[in-house]
Amino acid sequence: MENIMTLPKIKQVRAWFTGGATAEKGAGGGDYHDQGANHWIDDHIATPMSKYRDYEQSRQSFGINVLGTLVVEVEAENGQTGFAVSTAGEMGCFIVEKHLNRFIEGKCVSDIKLIHDQMLSATLYYSGSGGLVMNTISCVDLALWDLFGKVVGLPVYKLLGGAVRDEIQFYATGARPDLAKEMGFIGGKMPTHWGPHDGDAGIRKDAAMVADMREKCGEDFWLMLDCWMSQDVNYATKLAHACAPYNLKWIEECLPPQQYEGYRELKRNAPVGMMVTSGEHHGTLQSFRTLSETGIDIMQPDVGWCGGLTTLVEIAAIAKSRGQLVVPHGSSVYSHHAVITFTNTPFSEFLMTSPDCSTMRPQFDPILLNEPVPVNGRIHKSVLDKPGFGVELNRDCNLKRPYSH
């Protein structure tokens, strides 16, 4: 008989945070909303809070950046480590160190699905439909995949079965699709700036923005709108039709996550050929099944928020069974290793984190070292050919470990 590789057990899990309300502001990293002043990501973007004038101008004014970055590191008995980052900050550290640790330590590094199910089952009574708890579980799951890849010496995408294409092509999310086109991206997705409280004037302003970018970018470059849960069905439907003359490719996350009937109605009434998309703030596999049943065109889970890579693979299968695309909310290497193995992900998202969208800054900068960025709008699979997720933790980021066990 051939010898089978003996895998080590997990010795310890540790959790740090940086940024957020209890640390330095503008830290970036896993909480990419935690940016400094004069950044497009915080400039009068429509949100569910925009109807309150005190919180209309800035998303940071209502606390979008209070959580900060969570870093989870798992160490095997042989000394090898894996890690991941997400948005959960100091509270995520508590959950990892005081609750989830019992399901991780002592397990084999390959026991990812067992650990995942135990974490989900043990937090049902306080996790609700996602949010902070699911962000934390996602971060642990990603760290486990990173460790497993490093122990066996393979990139995560090969652990998932290998690439189905040679490269990933990207669209860019940011305020300047015209600059994204110059950088080689296939499309540009802009945030909306107005909402139902602004009435028809808001629709005219956002439609004018799309018209202006269509003129700058030409006929064939993709243009999309990200509405960040800020609308109702009637407003979203009117906005979609107002943008139809400018060949808007899709309208994204118009409604809050649980308004499934609203998404069904929006898809039914949207202009022919315009796609309806959503999913980044859905936090359970069950919610994605229900979202899929509404008939939307693209589901957009965030691998750092939906339950991790283990859940993302399951979501992709649900979408594939219905002929839907799954295009994850931008998550850098954590998405790259997944989508290059999905047959129903023909393109992916790159989130522009440079303040004016004029330069290529890694999404989770500065917390990850060696984080790849698209070149001419693409990343070749060979760039991902490093053990685990292929990135290292920047330990100069003033990481704090508030709890231990």
From Swiss-Prot:
Q: Where is this site: Transition state stabilizer?
A: 349
Residues the UniProt record annotates as site (Increases basicity of active site His): 302
Q: How is the cofactor bound?
A: Binds 1 Mg(2+) ion per subunit.
Q: What is the required cofactor set for this protein?
A: Mg(2+)
Where along the chain is substrate bound? 33, 59, 349
Family annotation (CDD domains): MR_like_2 (cd03327)
* Disulfide pairings: none
In this protein, the active site sits at: 329
Q: Which domain of life is it from?
A: Bacteria
Statement: the UniProt record of this protein carries the keyword Metal-binding: yes
Which InterPro entries does this chain map to?
Enolase-like_C_sf (IPR036849), Enolase-like_N (IPR029017), Enolase_C-like (IPR029065), L-Rhamnon_dehydrat (IPR023444), Mandel_Rmase/mucon_lact_enz_CS (IPR018110), Mandelate_racemase_C (IPR013342), Mandelate_racemase_N_dom (IPR013341), RHMD-like (IPR046945)
A Pfam family cross-referenced in the UniProt record is MR_MLE_N
State which Enzyme Commission number(s) the record gives: 4.2.1.90
Q: Which GO terms describe its molecular function?
A: L-rhamnonate dehydratase activity; magnesium ion binding
Q: Which positions does UniProt annotate for Mg(2+) binding? A: 226, 252, 280
Cite any additional comment in the entry. Answer: Reaction proceeds via a syn dehydration.
Q: Belongs to which family?
A: Belongs to the mandelate racemase/muconate lactonizing enzyme family. RhamD subfamily.
What is this protein's record name? L-rhamnonate dehydratase
Organism encoding this protein: Escherichia coli O9:H4 (strain HS)
